[in-house]
């Protein structure tokens, strides 16, 4: 695929989005994932129920190379909606490929925020290649608005 672009995910992408979500949790979760909860979040994003998913890959139902899942809702202290990034993931075999998939997914999320006119909350919660991920986000979003800590936990349920 020479032209890498993000399209909005649709219900036909459910199985592929679930595959990516499970891979992402294996690589980066810090507690054991609940597959049913993952499925509910993925389906809600694909059907625009409080969110949306951006995907890179073939057409609907075809293999995906990467995805971002966004949820729209209030923060704990306000009824005002925000966009909260739930996951951004690119399959390992496409991370070094030309096209800048992670950047395109981040830029797509930024576009969703611009189009809706509401804030986007997005960050890096990872113990692997953290600095590179932060640099990417700084290029797309500007200066960070804080830092995140994990105590008594480490990201990544599998080694590698």
Residue ranges and their predicted role:
Residues 90, 96-111:
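Conserved acetyl-CoA-binding loop-helix of GNAT-fold acetyltransferases
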Residues 134, 138-160:
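C-terminal "cap" of GNAT-fold acetyltransferases
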């Amino acid at each position: 695929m020479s032209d890498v672009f993000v399209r909005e995910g649709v219900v036909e992408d459910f199985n592929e989005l679930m595959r990516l979500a499970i891979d992402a949790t294996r690589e980066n979760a810090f507690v054991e994932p609940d597959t049913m909860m993952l499925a509910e979040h993925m389906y809600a994003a694909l059907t625009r129920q409080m969110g949306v998913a951006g995907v890179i890959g073939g057409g609907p139902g075809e293999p995906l190379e990467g995805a971002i899942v966004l949820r729209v809702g209030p923060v704990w202290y306000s009824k005002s909606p925000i966009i909260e990034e739930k996951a951004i993931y690119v399959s390992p075999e496409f991370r070094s490929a030309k096209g800048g998939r992670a950047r395109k997914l981040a830029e797509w999320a930024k576009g969703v925020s611009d189009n809706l006119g509401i804030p986007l909350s997005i960050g890096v919660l990872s113990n692997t290649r953290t600095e590179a991920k932060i640099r990417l986000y700084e290029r797309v979003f500007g200066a960070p608005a804080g830092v995140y800590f994990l105590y008594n936990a480490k990201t990544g349920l599998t080694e590698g």
